[in-house]
Amino acid sequence: MGRPQRGDTAKERRERQDKVTSPPESGPISQSGLSDTVDWTSETNENMWLAYDFDERKDINQARGQDIHRDQELFDVVLQNNMSDDQFASTSASVSDDWYDTGFDQAFLQPSSTSTTAYSVEPSPFISIEPPTLTKETKKRNSQSSDSSKPSSTSSQSLIERVTSLNLDLHQQSIIAGQIVDEFGNIDPDMIDPLHKDNRLSFAVDSMTQGLQNFHSLLLEIINTANGTTFSSESASPHVNRPPIQQQQSPSRFLAPPSRSCVPSLFCFREGNSSQQQSKNNATGIDLPTSLMIISCHIHLIRLCRHVFAGIRAALSSKDQHQQALLVLSSCQVGGVSISHDSDLKLLILIQVVARLINKIGVLLGYPCSPADLSNSAVGNLGNATEDERKKMLLPQLLRFVLAQEGVAGQSSHGDGMEGLREEIRKLNEVLATS
């Protein structure tokens, strides 16, 4: 039997497809029929794969066309939506994955994660402020200025604390000395027992002399710190731009100069061309609170001296108790020297020492006259001061007010200041002269 024609093959293919789709008839199947069925099935399957392959390719191409058309529509929609936003026009779809925040004010675009090489971050638009690079000379100059300013501020603070402490101590000592004078004033002189254990006159004398020396030493140190001058025992003239005397040195190193012309006054820093004078002498000046504290110390010190001399005069008022009172005072030391052989001589030396120290303190405070000229009855006058001496005063009006209250400038006073001290010393000299 020959090979079938192409037309018959198509016809047979349709018939065979109909047979395959129709259910087989029930009944016994013979061996020959089974073999025929297998042959038909294999041939049919071979032809069917060809048909299905063509149909599948057709369906796949159609699906691909639909997907391409759908993607084109989606791309058109996205493009239309993003045309109004230029920010995302040049970015890719992976921008959201590669965007990270490095701070509240900086944001950078990280390179692609597929790159394994090191990357450099773009510079921030914000300029970082860094300290300028200092040269060696600038660093050395800054270190020297800081080192020199720290000891100066520390020394000034220490001096202020010492002035405050001394002012409080002098105030308390003056109150105690005033109580001693009141006790002697309320008791008959013949009933006073200088040898009594409660007699505090000897301690009052010690506190007076020690207070004068401490105040004079501290006043010199304050002036030295303020204007950079130092007094030493080798020379009477001040040495400019030398470091101030250390605190551990004994007060005996502070020697007052013999004349007023070479003494830097406490009240000479804020008049006229004071800024030029300060820059010339490297002077820092003395502030107003420190100046007022110094004046307060001076007032309490003069009051203490007046009370002490009033107590000594009251103890020596009785002739019977005169020798006993001198025996009590004989234990006192004047300037570290004890004179036990002659008590009258000791009292005279005590008066001279107090007068001398008060004169030195007055000159350092800028008094244009000798406020403690206790040997003379005449009182100094501010009118005797020269024009240069007036310009040296820091607060002329305040100084005049203080001197007027203390009875220095020939004005009336309540007998509680310098004039009262002069009166007490004059009366004590009379007692010593009649003894």
Curated annotation (Swiss-Prot):
Ranges of Basic and acidic residues composition bias in the record: 1-19
| Predominant subcellular localization, coarse grouping | nucleus
Q: Can you list the GO cellular component terms from the UniProt entry?
A: nucleus
Keywords assigned by UniProt, alphabetized: Nucleus, Transcription, Transcription regulation, Virulence
Disulphide bonds in the chain: none
Which residue ranges are recorded for the region named Disordered? 1-40, 115-158, 231-257
Q: Which compartments does it reside in?
A: Nucleus
Record-given protein name: Transcription factor gkaF
Q: Which organism is it from?
A: Penicillium citrinum
Identify the coding gene. gkaF
